[in-house]
A protein has these predicted regions:
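Type III/flagellar secretion export determinants
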Residues: 1-206
Length: 206
């Protein structure tokens, strides 16, 4: 049998620019078990690593359906598993055409470290991407079927830039039992209402 478990928790206090203190606590647990009754052949493929922000759930998952998208920005579209409902890619529309054209407009799809890419925009050095950073007003969440929504419009106030490792190999197993992605690391974001959610590096099999 193959078994995998993961627990994540975060707690702390954050002081906002207007002097308010927000106490936060967040956690989730994941588990996977498969009884292997016959030999399983896993398709080896390249992993692409975009950041995913979970607006309506605590952790990212993948569906057994796919969409076409040039995740590695090589001019050829790749077949990728769809994010489960409630999760979105964190995106930056660099050419302002109201579309996400390829993986260069996501975080981590090319470098493999989306949190490090995002940290380059932390102008005030407070370890958050928030209203004190000029990129905040340009960041969006994105799903192919829904298009772009500004992070401020969906209630995201700040994204913490220091993730912890949360390795989980079996994300979105398809009907053949093949993993469609790997969870690498997790951090948190603060909502405008004072609650928190998760941001994760999710490696997709292309």
């Amino acid at each position: 049998a193959e078994r995998e478990q993961l627990r994540f928790s975060a707690s702390g206090s954050v002081q906002t620019a207007d002097g308010k203190t927000i106490d936060l606590k967040l956690g989730f647990a994941m588990s996977y078990q498969q009884l292997q009754l016959s030999e399983r052949i896993t398709r080896e493929s390249a992993l692409k690593d975009p950041l995913v922000i979970n607006l309506e759930k605590q952790f990212a998952d993948l569906q057994d359906t796919r969409f076409e998208f040039d995740i590695d920005s090589d001019g050829t579209k790749d077949s990728l598993a769809n994010l489960s409902q409630g999760s979105y890619f964190l995106a930056l529309d660099k050419n302002n055409n109201q579309e996400i054209d390829n993986g260069s407009e996501l975080f981590g799809a090319q470098s493999g470290n989306g949190f490090a890419e995002l940290a380059q925009y932390d102008e005030d050095g407070n370890s958050f991407i928030d209203e004190g950073d000029s990129i905040y007003a340009k960041l969006s969440v994105w799903r192919p079927e829904k298009g772009l929504m500004a992070i401020a419009d969906v209630g995201v106030g700040a994204i913490y830039l220091h993730p912890v490792e949360t390795q989980f190999q079996n994300i979105g197993n398809n009907s053949e039992g093949e993993s469609q992605g790997v969870l690498r690391s997790s951090s948190i974001y603060l909502k405008e209402d004072g609650t928190a959610g998760t941001v994760q590096q999710l490696d997709l099999r292309a």
